Amino acid sequence: MNAGSDPVVIISAARTAIGSFNGALSTVPVHNLGTTVIKEVLQRAKVAPEEVSEVIFGHVLTAGCGQNPTRQASVGAGIPYSVPAWSCQMICGSGLKAVCLAAQSIAMGDSTIVVAGGMENMSKAPHLAHLRSGVKMGEVPLADSILCDGLTDAFHNYHMGITAENVAKKWQVSREAQDKVAVVSQNRAEHAQKAGHFDKEIVPVHVSSRKGLTEVKIDEFPRHGSNLEAMSKLKPYFLTDGTGTVTPANASGMNDGAAAVVLMKKTEAESRMLKPLAQVVSWSQAGVEPSVMGVGPIPAIKQAVAKAGWSLEDVDVFEINEAFAAVSAAIAKELGLSPEKVNIDGGAIALGHPLGASGCRILVTLLHTLERVGGTRGVAALCIGGGMGIAMCVQRG
């Protein structure tokens, strides 16, 4: 996709705070998280619910969430029944793929205004058992839907953490190098939180409990005061034979949250006297060997940047999802990226990784970061379980 004479622009962008696993947002149904961000981005964009053409959300762990959770989120936000709403599933890339699909729909003339984003409540993901034909004797094992539908490679039947170990070995990323990436992520996120960098992008979620109504508006997952000495003491989690390097501290978390953006053509924004946050310049997706799925952003970023007519040096800010520190280090190494341009307010190792939401979450953070630092060009990218990568180029001004 190329911007053309009437590019697709992003008018507003917001996200919830990211909750820890079984934490502050764990009791909130996923569609309610979606509803919260949809309402917020419509209000910021000065768009009435009935003016929306379509709602597209990334969502991965749908089991037990009811029929079409995105439709539930859309209707909950006051968008009329006449407006279609649907989910897309591309594992970690779902939330960004939803934005790509929205831009595509607008560029083709099928839609005028689209709300796109992603949502996930990993805390509410159920355990599963297949009992259709009954059980004559013995126990029935329960499968964790987070693992079987979200975090286990379908081709090699091992955890995403093993794919990170494969990347660490192939790209020669040491345990110390991974821990350094993780500490930088935590320290940057701590600084960003204390400086209020996330305040503008976060919409509060009101959570009911026995104690009454609680307002959740601060990312819960970052560990302030993180340091290399403490991090180096953790044992490898996925490989315990003495060769492992990936630990809970240098990997992203399991989390809850939602994010959304409002898109329309530039001329539509002008007619409404709205100032875009950025225009969508290009996007790309790529496939890689599933055993090293974490390097998927390398070809995706190269292709998206080439489509935009940019060089990597032209990019002011990169938001690249930190599924694992090993992956982040390999991508930066392969592309020759300056650490000062990548995840400048911390990444998923510190903030968390709610699967279906992360793609749009990093885009929301990218847009607000570009605005805050006065940057012009940005790239959002994620690796994707199963061996893929997705990237989007956006430009302010």
From Swiss-Prot:
Main enzyme class: transferase
GO biological process, one term: liver development
Compartmental location: Cytoplasm, Cytosol
Record-marked site positions (Increases nucleophilicity of active site Cys): 353
PROSITE patterns referenced in this protein's UniProt entry, alphabetically: THIOLASE_2 (PS00737), THIOLASE_3 (PS00099)
Record-listed CoA binding positions: 223, 226, 252
Residues with PTM N-acetylmethionine: 1
Keyword Acyltransferase carried by entry: yes
Record-linked Pfam families: Thiolase_C, Thiolase_N
GO MF annotation: an example: acetyl-CoA C-acetyltransferase activity
Entry's Gene Ontology cellular component terms: cytoplasm; cytosol; peroxisome
UniProt-listed Gene3D superfamilies: 3.40.47.10
Modified residues annotated as N6-acetyllysine in this record: 200, 233, 235
Substrates-to-products reaction catalysed: 2 acetyl-CoA = acetoacetyl-CoA + CoA
Enzyme nomenclature, EC number: 2.3.1.9
Matching InterPro entries: Thiolase, Thiolase-like, Thiolase_AS, Thiolase_C, Thiolase_CS, Thiolase_N
UniProt pathway annotation: Lipid metabolism; fatty acid metabolism
Signal sequence, start to end: none
Active site residues per record: 92, 383
Description of how the protein assembles with itself and partners: Homotetramer.
PANTHER family xref list: ACETYL-COA ACETYLTRANSFERASE, CYTOSOLIC, ACETYL-COA C-ACYLTRANSFERASE
Reported function: Involved in the biosynthetic pathway of cholesterol.
Similarity annotation: Belongs to the thiolase-like superfamily. Thiolase family.
Protein's name according to its UniProt entry: Acetyl-CoA acetyltransferase, cytosolic
Upper taxonomic lineage: Eukaryota, Metazoa, Chordata, Craniata, Vertebrata
Gene: Acat2
